């Protein structure tokens, strides 16, 4: 197998801890996973193209969950912090996610992600598409 073939395969940054989990992976931005994920969330082709043009290798956080009775204990902070470290080690230049504002949460998830340095660059199905440049 050639090195180029290895780098085209997604690298998992998924993790599960007691009380929560995060699902994500790192891919080259010209691979179909980025387009497929953002399209399925309702992102415009302009948003997708701008990400692909800015970053060659990108991490995608598809899903994060913290058990309701464990929220407020730092589990989400640890999951995102570990995902940022894993993405950086895997060569990602940025992390992209769609902040789920439709979910019933006691906190503003968009502001919470902004606390890590994520910035909104567009929307997908009415939810913010957020990017953290590494």
Where are these regions (language model features)?
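Conserved N-terminal entry element of GNAT/NAT acetyltransferase domains
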Residues: 1-19
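Short beta-strand micro-motifs in enzyme catalytic cores
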Residues: 11-13, 57-59, 128-130
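Conserved acyl-donor/pantetheine-binding loop and adjacent beta-alpha core of acyl/acetyltransferases
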Residues: 16-60
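Residue-level recognition of the GNAT/N-acetyltransferase active site
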Residues: 62, 67, 100
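Conserved acetyl-CoA-binding loop-helix of GNAT-fold acetyltransferases
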Residues: 66, 72-85
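Conserved short alpha-helix immediately C-terminal to the canonical SAM/SAH-binding motif I
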Residues: 79, 105, 109
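Conserved GNAT acetyl-CoA-binding A-motif
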Residues: 87-102
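Conserved catalytic-core motifs of GNAT/GCN5-like acyltransferases
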Residues: 98-99, 110, 114-131
């Amino acid at each position: 197998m050639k090195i180029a073939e290895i780098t085209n395969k997604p690298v998992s940054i998924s993790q599960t801890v007691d009380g929560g989990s995060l699902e994500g992976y790192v891919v080259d931005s010209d691979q179909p996973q980025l387009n497929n994920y953002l399209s399925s969330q309702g992102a415009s082709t302009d948003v997708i193209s701008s990400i692909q043009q800015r970053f060659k290798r990108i991490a995608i956080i598809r899903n994060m969950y913290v058990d309701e009775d464990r929220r407020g204990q730092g589990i989400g902070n640890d999951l995102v912090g570990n995902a940022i470290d894993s993405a950086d080690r895997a060569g990602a230049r940025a992390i992209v996610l769609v902040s789920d504002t439709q979910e019933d949460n006691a906190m503003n998830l968009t502001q919470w992600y902004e606390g890590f340095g994520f910035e909104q660059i567009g929307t997908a199905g009415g939810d913010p598409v957020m990017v953290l440049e590494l």
